């Protein structure tokens, strides 16, 4: 940044003192492209639209900075240097050829429309549903039931809540629960008489 100042003043001095016009025009064109690149938003890295500058000296598009501030209402810091920043701590920039002199901070981007995604349909049988407790049974080898800690400490977060009584899913779960209980009783009775 410090090197740009002397080259600009040197090219201005050479053109004002009657230096060669070819070198000053090539420097002027080079400065123009560099000048266009210096007015980039530090968030979207595009040419700043409705440019504002923070008190710490960083340039932003107002729509980009507004979105940045809205998504972090509790911690409003500059995206570049993490200095404190707010709507009141930015200064609008009005360049040559700008048509509107309206403060860009007064124009907030429109709020996006809300969208409600449809719930995920898991389908199929979700598990046992003894009452509303969502009883879980686990099997193991010998005296080591593998699922006792998950059942005792309720670590099984992946299971959905039981079905609401009166729904077709609840009726299906009750039917399957009774069917498995009947099968278990038949097997136990068969083991007793064998």
Curated annotation (Swiss-Prot):
Residues 1-32, 92-125 are annotated as: Disordered. GO terms for molecular function: ubiquitin protein ligase activity; ubiquitin-like protein conjugating enzyme binding; zinc ion binding. Residues 31-82 are annotated as: Required for ubiquitin ligase activity and protection against ER stress-induced cell death. The chain crosses the membrane at residues 133-153, 174-194. GO terms for biological process: autophagy; defense response to virus; ERAD pathway; innate immune response; positive regulation of type I interferon-mediated signaling pathway; protein K27-linked ubiquitination; ubiquitin-dependent protein catabolic process. GO terms for cellular component: endoplasmic reticulum membrane; mitochondrial outer membrane. Pathway: Protein modification; protein ubiquitination. PROSITE patterns: ZF_RING_1, ZF_RING_2. Keywords: Autophagy, Endoplasmic reticulum, Immunity, Innate immunity, Membrane, Metal-binding, Mitochondrion, Mitochondrion outer membrane, Transferase, Transmembrane, Transmembrane helix, Ubl conjugation pathway, Zinc, Zinc-finger. CDD domains: RING-HC_RNF185. A zinc finger (RING-type) spans 41-82. It is found in: Mitochondrion outer membrane; Endoplasmic reticulum membrane. It is a multi-pass membrane protein. It is an enzyme of class 2 (transferase). It catalyses: S-ubiquitinyl-[E2 ubiquitin-conjugating enzyme]-L-cysteine + [acceptor protein]-L-lysine = [E2 ubiquitin-conjugating enzyme]-L-cysteine + N(6)-ubiquitinyl-[acceptor protein]-L-lysine. Gene3D superfamilies: Zinc/RING finger domain, C3HC4 (zinc finger) (3.30.40.10). InterPro entries: RNF5/RNF185-like, Znf_C3HC4_RING-type, Znf_RING, Znf_RING/FYVE/PHD, Znf_RING_CS. Its EC number is 2.3.2.27. E3 ubiquitin-protein ligase that regulates selective mitochondrial autophagy by mediating 'Lys-63'-linked polyubiquitination. Acts in the endoplasmic reticulum (ER)-associated degradation (ERAD) pathway, which targets misfolded proteins that accumulate in the endoplasmic reticulum (ER) for ubiquitination and subsequent proteasome-mediated degradation. Protects cells from ER stress-induced apoptosis. Responsible for the cotranslational ubiquitination and degradation of CFTR in the ERAD pathway. The RING-type zinc finger domain is responsible for E3 ubiquitin ligase activity. This is E3 ubiquitin-protein ligase RNF185. It comes from Gallus gallus.
């Amino acid at each position: 940044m410090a090197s740009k100042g002397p080259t600009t003043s040197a090219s201005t001095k050479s053109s004002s003192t009657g230096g060669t016009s070819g070198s000053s025009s090539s420097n002027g064109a080079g400065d123009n492209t560099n000048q266009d690149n210096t007015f980039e938003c530090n968030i979207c890295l595009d040419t700043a639209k409705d440019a504002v500058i923070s008190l710490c000296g960083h340039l932003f598009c107002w729509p980009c900075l507004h979105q940045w501030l809205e998504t972090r209402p509790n911690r409003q810091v500059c995206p570049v240097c993490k200095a404190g920043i707010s709507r009141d701590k930015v200064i609008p920039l009005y360049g040559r050829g700008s048509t509107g002199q309206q403060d860009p901070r007064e124009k907030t981007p429109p709020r996006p429309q809300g969208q409600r995604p449809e719930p995920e349909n898991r389908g199929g049988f979700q598990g046992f549903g003894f009452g509303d407790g969502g009883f879980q049974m686990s099997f193991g080898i010998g005296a080591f039931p593998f699922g006792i800690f998950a059942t005792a400490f309720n670590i099984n977060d992946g299971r959905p809540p039981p079905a609401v009584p009166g729904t077709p899913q609840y009726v299906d779960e009750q039917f399957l629960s009774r069917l498995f209980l009947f099968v278990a009783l038949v097997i136990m009775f068969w083991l007793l008489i064998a």
